[in-house]
Amino acid sequence: VEISEHLDALRREGALLADAAGRTDLDAPVPTCPEWRLRDLLLHTGQVHRWATAIVRDRLRQPPDEAATRAARGPDPDDAGLLGWFRDGHAALVAELDRAPAGLDCWSFLPAKSPLAFWARRQAHETAVHRVDAESAAGAAEPTATDPAFAADGLAELLTGFLVRPRGRLRSERTRTLLVRATDRPVSWLVTIGRDPVTVTEGAGAGPADCTVTGRAHDLYLLLWNRLPADRAEVAGDASLLDLWREGSPIRWG
């Protein structure tokens, strides 16, 4: 997926998120994130957008400290202005990434072809996952489908970027393997979970695994981001691995 495609996705997903939020009350619970109300979701996503905008705009070479993060986020809006505040922050992020040079030099935290490629990709998927949360809060029976190529790209970011970081919490006393295989894209990943940090092998469709999860890229994307139940995919083998996934895979920033 190219930078321009990630930017198109970021535009689209932010607009869909705002549209869903506008259809319900700020106190509406978010079923996909039970600890949140819609208000929390908008604040979180809007703050992340402003944080990312500041990193790109100011060409920061290291993570912003607490004071810089607070300055980037600005004051929280009141309820009456929250949705407009979200839309403004989303538009500013898209504009900043759109005008950034290809040779942008700034901090990033996952492997990528370039810092610009990283931030366009990360914010597109950040916004897409939270768009699903907003649709959940608005009572949608089904989330808006994501393009298979975009969903597969999101799976790759999650599995080969986030999941393999040394501080990841997904661990097992004995080595166990999970094969993730899409039916509508030629992609698969073999995830090895043990006492050490997770390892992931791409293109591992022929490899044996303790548990194999097969489905559309869209369903796998949301399942592995813990936004859909396991019954949305075909599960073969030791299904308890998916319980282990749900316990250990959520992203932690602390």
Residue ranges and their predicted role:
Residues G81-V129:
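Hydrophobic alpha-helical segments and helix pairs
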Residues G205-G254:
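C-terminal interaction segments
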Residues D25-D65, P111-G168, L220:
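Short, contiguous alpha-helical
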Residues S4-R73, G81-G84, D88-G89, L93:
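Active-site-proximal cofactor/substrate-binding loop regions of enzyme domains
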Residues D153-I193:
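A glycine-rich beta-turn/hairpin centered on an aromatic-Pro dipeptide
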